[in-house]
């Protein structure tokens, strides 16, 4: 379905001329990236019973967070776009230019990359390893065949606020105002 959405917008000129469809394409791309960069790797690991991709784990975790964040932020941008289009249609036509749309899309994707890759590459996202009962300091998290994506409490809370709760609150407000 995602590919069909992209193909339709690319194929039909009247769909390309609507700024709103830029946001739809951005959402479709984020969903497509989940299907390409996240799901296959996890499926192979689940089938194999271990993580066969070694140090690719951190990059995979960053892609997972990035794609999920991009999807949510794109949904948020779409809700704001629809609110502006409905609440101020004449101003919307003047202000929501392709340039403005690309800026909003760029902000959503930039935030997604920053929120995912920086914390993951700096290991801010990881829960502190716990020592096993035998007192050995190594953790399962450190083994090559385990891609443990357990999150630290601080990262989990801050990431949830920025990546999920704030965008959902914005969407709830915009759609509530639209339906009034």
Curated annotation (Swiss-Prot):
Glycans are attached at residue 136. InterPro entries: Dopamine_rcpt, GPCR_Rhodpsn, GPCR_Rhodpsn_7TM. It is a multi-pass membrane protein. Keywords: Cell membrane, Cell projection, Disulfide bond, Endoplasmic reticulum, G-protein coupled receptor, Glycoprotein, Lipoprotein, Membrane, Palmitate, Receptor, Transducer, Transmembrane, Transmembrane helix. GO terms for biological process: adenylate cyclase-activating adrenergic receptor signaling pathway; positive regulation of MAPK cascade. It is found in: Cell membrane; Endoplasmic reticulum membrane; Cell projection, Cilium membrane. GO terms for molecular function: dopamine neurotransmitter receptor activity, coupled via Gs; G protein-coupled receptor activity. Interacts with DNAJC14 via its C-terminus. Interacts with DRD2. Interacts with DORIP1. The lineage of its organism: Eukaryota, Metazoa, Chordata, Craniata, Vertebrata. Disulfide bonds join 57-147. GO terms for cellular component: ciliary membrane; dendritic spine; endoplasmic reticulum membrane. The chain crosses the membrane at residues 1-10, 22-48, 58-80, 100-124, 154-179. This is D(1A) dopamine receptor. Dopamine receptor whose activity is mediated by G proteins which activate adenylyl cyclase. Pfam families: 7tm_1.
